[in-house]
């Protein structure tokens, strides 16, 4: 997840927290087409649908880490705005999910209200594939930086999709062509913030964002504070079965989404959710739901 600057500001990850050991793959090895790394990545897609990519060892990976840190800076600036200002950019669910979702607008698995601010930035708006919309001032001021993040994140995900092409018997580039940057899609950069819980609140049992699977082809997630949990495939949706994903400096989490599962059948039905921790601000810069654009 981003560079060490943000990890240095975060509380230590609790030693007694139940975690899940996801595999970590070298982005440099995937770029070079290392067959062993590719085979293990394909196996992780089938078993978990989640894995970590170490971006340290690649020039392109380090560029993306820098971009992700810029998105974290934007996240802080954005969610420092007052509530009345943020509400001016509210999304229009379910018709249009672009824009701001205030904390407490959704119900979580336990019937309580969510504890997560969320802002979806539409890729087509940023890249000029459709008429520009008016976003919150910090987003408008950082359009060039968001565009860089989108392009570099897309290139990173393309390396993963080409690896999957190889193991699915497809021509290289087949899966990437379903999500071209120059055509309209529902791809988003999603910024999230879960404020600190009130003192004395039952934080471990508090669900910040309910369990779900992602709707697109792939998601690239950057996190610093360990609120993300995964429910392994086949286990009952009970609190004790969920496992935290420990954030790792310099790594990004990849999630295989529902669309790619439908097209390829490669993933077990693993869910994710976000749970709060005491005294922490959970900030995520999340690229893409990469959606089928309808391109031939």
Regions found by a protein language model. Give the residues of each.
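Peripheral, non-catalytic segments flanking oxidoreductase cores
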Residues: 1-296
């Amino acid at each position: 997840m981003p560079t060490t600057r943000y990890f240095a500001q975060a509380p230590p990850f609790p030693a007694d927290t139940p975690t899940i050991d996801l595999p970590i793959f070298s982005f440099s090895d995937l770029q070079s087409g290392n067959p062993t790394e590719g085979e293990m990545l394909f196996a992780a897609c089938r078993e978990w649908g989640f894995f970590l990519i170490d971006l340290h060892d690649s020039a392109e990976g380090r560029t993306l880490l820098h971009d992700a840190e810029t998105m974290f800076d934007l996240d802080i600036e954005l969610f420092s705005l007052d509530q009345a200002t943020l509400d001016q950019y509210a999304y229009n669910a379910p018709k249009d999910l672009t824009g701001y979702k205030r904390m407490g607008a959704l119900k979580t698995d336990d019937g309580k209200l969510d504890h997560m601010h969320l802002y979806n930035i539409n890729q087509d708006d940023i890249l000029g594939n459709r008429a520009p919309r008016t976003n919150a001032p910090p987003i408008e001021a950082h359009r060039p930086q968001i565009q860089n993040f989108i392009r570099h994140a897309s290139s990173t995900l393309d390396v993963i999709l080409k690896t999957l092409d190889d193991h699915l018997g497809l021509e290289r580039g087949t899966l990437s062509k379903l999500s071209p940057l120059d055509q309209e899609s529902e791809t988003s950069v999603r910024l999230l913030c879960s404020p600190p819980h009130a003192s004395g609140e039952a934080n471990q049992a508090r669900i910040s964002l309910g369990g779900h699977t992602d709707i697109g082809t792939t998601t690239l997630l950057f996190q610093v504070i360990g609120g993300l949990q995964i429910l392994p495939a086949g286990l009952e949706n009970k609190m004790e079965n969920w496992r935290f994903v420990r954030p790792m400096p310099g790594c990004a989490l990849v999630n295989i989404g529902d669309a790619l599962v439908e097209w390829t059948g490669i993933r077990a039905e693993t869910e994710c959710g976000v749970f709060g921790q005491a005294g922490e601000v959970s900030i995520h810069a999340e690229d893409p739901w990469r959606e089928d654009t309808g391109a031939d």
